[in-house]
C-alpha cells in the first residue's frame, strides 16, 4: 500500500507572491479546485488518506485465519510437499507448523 501525505496549510504558502493572490481568489468560489480539495484531506475522486497497517497487527490478523478453519483446502505448504501416507492420521489435514503443534 502507498501512504499518501496530506498537505498542511503552512506548506502551501511556500509559493511565489503572485500565486498566493491567485489562491485567495479561487477560495472565494463555491466549487473547490483540486488543490483546495487536497487541503481537506481528499482528492477530487473521493479517496481518503490511507493508513499503513503495523506489520505486527497484520501478522496477528493472518494468524487467526489458520488453515485449520478451512475444510476443503489444505494450506499452500501442504500442497507443495505431499509426503508420507495420507491415510495415517486423517484428523490432521495439514502439515504446517500450526497444525502439527495443535494435534501433538
Swiss-Prot record:
Pfam families given in the database record: Protamine_P2
Composition bias type Basic and acidic residues, residue spans: 33-44
Main subcellular location of this protein, as a coarse class: nucleus
Stretch list, region Disordered: 1-91
Superkingdom of origin organism: Eukaryota
Entry-annotated residues carrying Phosphoserine: 8, 10, 33
Subcellular location: Nucleus; Chromosome
Tissue expression remark: Testis.
UniProt biased composition (Basic residues): 45-91
The record's account of how the chain is modified after translation: Proteolytic processing into mature chains is required for histone eviction during spermatogenesis. Transition proteins (TNP1 and TNP2) are required for processing.
Keyword terms: Chromosome, Developmental protein, Differentiation, DNA condensation, DNA-binding, Nucleosome core, Nucleus, Phosphoprotein, Spermatogenesis
Presence of the UniProt keyword NAD in the record: no
UniProt keyword annotation of rRNA processing present: no
Protein's name according to its UniProt entry: Protamine-2
Organism per entry: Rattus norvegicus (Rat)
Amino acid at each position: 500500500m502507498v501512504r499518501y501525505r496530506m498537505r498542511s496549510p503552512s506548506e502551501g504558502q511556500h509559493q511565489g507572491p503572485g500565486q498566493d493572490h491567485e489562491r485567495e481568489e479561487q477560495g472565494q468560489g463555491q466549487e473547490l479546485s483540486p488543490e483546495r480539495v487536497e487541503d481537506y484531506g481528499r482528492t477530487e475522486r473521493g479517496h481518503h488518506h490511507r493508513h499503513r497497517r503495523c506489520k505486527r497487527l497484520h501478522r496477528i490478523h493472518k494468524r487467526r485465519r489458520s488453515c485449520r478453519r478451512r475444510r476443503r483446502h489444505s494450506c499452500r505448504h501442504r500442497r507443495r510437499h505431499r509426503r508420507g501416507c495420507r491415510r495415517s492420521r486423517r484428523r490432521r489435514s495439514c502439515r504446517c507448523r500450526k497444525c502439527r503443534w495443535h494435534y501433538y
